[in-house]
Amino acid sequence: MQLGLDFNLVEDLVAGVDEVGRGPLCGPVVTAAVILDPSRPILGLNDSKKLSEARREALFEEIREKALAWCIARAEVEEIDRLNILHATMLAMQRAVEGLSVIPRLALIDGNRCPKLAVPCAPVVKGDSQVPAIAAASILAKVSRDREMVELDRVYPGYGMAGHKGYPTAVHLEALSRLGPTPIHRRSFAPVRELLDVSVQ
């Protein structure tokens, strides 16, 4: 049985790029770019959403240790509200690729569109479950963002951020209507915007 993606698919100097956090009502959108080293296999790479939290945490450390190059980047809430979530995500992906210590010959982007990059790039739909470097990027981005949301839960208690990570769950929406938005809530997202509109009236 093949555990995770086949590491033989890893190509020289190909960066995988992915994002986490497009859907949440609060917090940054986090991206990562990873160039894997074909001579240093990492077993069990897969789409971060298909892995347990413990497995993601272990792989997070292994990827950072064994990858040829990696970079975690972000776009802040203010940028999301100013640019819109799609453009903010593209900006964060651009930052991740530009932050790599090794220039890739190709960047493979999870999804159906590419940011503007100085290197050739191609989109790969469902890339996080097909391309090992994109799977690695998805793990770095998710673990990094999840850890940050746990920290933000301590700063803004009562919203349950450590659990839902900012996504619009029933618990989050109820807390939002009861407590109002925090400075890290995305004012351009409908549930937050509607609350602010009501409070202005």
UniProtKB/Swiss-Prot annotation:
The keyword Cytoplasm is annotated on this UniProt entry: yes
Catalytic activity: Endonucleolytic cleavage to 5'-phosphomonoester
UniProt keywords, alphabetically: Cytoplasm, Endonuclease, Hydrolase, Manganese, Metal-binding, Nuclease
Cofactor: Mn(2+); Mg(2+)
GO biological process: DNA replication, removal of RNA primer; mismatch repair
Presence of the UniProt keyword Repeat in the record: no
Intracellular or extracellular location(s): Cytoplasm
GO annotations of cellular component type: cytoplasm; ribonuclease H2 complex
Cofactor: how bound: Manganese or magnesium. Binds 1 divalent metal ion per monomer in the absence of substrate. May bind a second metal ion after substrate binding.
Binding site for a divalent metal cation: 18-19, 110
Origin superkingdom: Bacteria
Single GO MF annotation: RNA binding
Enzyme class, first EC level, given as a word: hydrolase
Cystine crosslinks: none
NCBIfam families on file: PRK00015.1-1 (NF000594), PRK00015.1-3 (NF000595), PRK00015.1-4 (NF000596)
Function: Endonuclease that specifically degrades the RNA of RNA-DNA hybrids.
HAMAP family: RNase_HII_B (MF_00052_B)
Family listed: Belongs to the RNase HII family.
Identification of the protein by name: Ribonuclease HII
Source organism of this protein record: Pseudomonas aeruginosa (strain ATCC 15692 / DSM 22644 / CIP 104116 / JCM 14847 / LMG 12228 / 1C / PRS 101 / PAO1)
Lineage of source species: Bacteria, Pseudomonadati, Pseudomonadota, Gammaproteobacteria, Pseudomonadales
